[in-house]
C-alpha cells in the first residue's frame, strides 16, 4: 500500500485531491499507470499532459519527495518514519488510498525457473510468499 506524501510546505497548498494536479507527481518508471489510477480513484479531473517524474527506484523517488520536488507515492512502511519525524505529511490523509480496488494496487511477482525451486532458500521464500495473506492491510502506528 502507498501513502500520498509531500513536504509540509507543499502539503499546506493541497486542500483537495484536485490540488495534486498543480505539482509534479513522483513515481517509479515501472509504475507509470499508478498515478492515473490513483487520480481516477480520487475522482480528479486530469489535465492534458503528463506531470509525473519517474525514478528508477522507490528510494530515489522518496528522496525526491523529501527534497520537495513533488508529491510522492511512498510505501506505508517507509512513510511511517517520515510522517512520524515530520519530514513528510500526508495531505489527503494516511488512508486516502485504502479503498482502492485490489487490481489497481501495485503488486510484485516472484519469477523463478521451476528448477530453481530445488534450492532450499528459493523454495523457502516461495513457500513463505505463497502462504502470506497479502490482502490484509498493513497497519501503521498512530502518530505520537
Map each language-model feature to its residues.
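Short secondary-structure boundary/capping segments
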Residues: 17-18, 44-45, 99-102
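Generic beta-sheet signal
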Residues: 5-7, 28, 73, 91
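Alpha-helix/helix-capping structural signal
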Residues: 8-9, 30-33, 59, 77-78
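C-terminal effector-binding regulatory domain of bacterial HTH transcription factors
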Residues: 80, 85, 93-144
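Secondary-structure junction motif
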Residues: 24-44
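Flexible hinge/capping segments at coil-to-helix
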Residues: 1-25
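Hydrophobic hinge/microswitch elements
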Residues: 46-96
Amino acid at each position: 500500500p502507498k501513502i500520498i506524501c509531500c513536504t509540509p510546505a507543499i502539503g499546506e497548498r493541497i486542500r483537495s485531491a484536485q490540488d495534486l494536479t498543480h505539482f509534479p507527481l513522483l513515481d517509479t518508471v515501472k509504475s507509470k499507470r499508478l498515478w492515473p489510477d490513483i487520480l481516477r480513484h480520487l475522482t480528479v479531473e486530469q489535465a492534458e499532459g503528463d506531470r509525473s517524474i519517474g525514478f528508477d527506484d522507490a528510494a530515489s523517488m522518496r528522496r525526491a519527495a523529501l527534497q520537495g520536488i513533488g508529491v510522492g507515492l511512498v510505501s506505508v512502511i517507509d512513510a511511517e518514519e517520515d510522517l512520524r519525524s515530520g519530514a513528510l505529511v500526508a495531505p489527503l490523509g494516511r488512508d486516502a488510498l485504502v479503498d482502492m480496488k485490489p487490481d489497481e494496487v501495485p503488486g510484485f511477482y516472484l519469477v523463478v525457473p521451476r528448477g530453481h525451486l530445488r534450492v532450499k532458500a528459493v523454495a523457502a521464500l516461495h513457500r513463505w510468499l505463497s502462504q502470506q495473506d497479502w490482502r490484509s492491510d498493513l497497519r501503521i502506528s498512530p502518530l505520537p
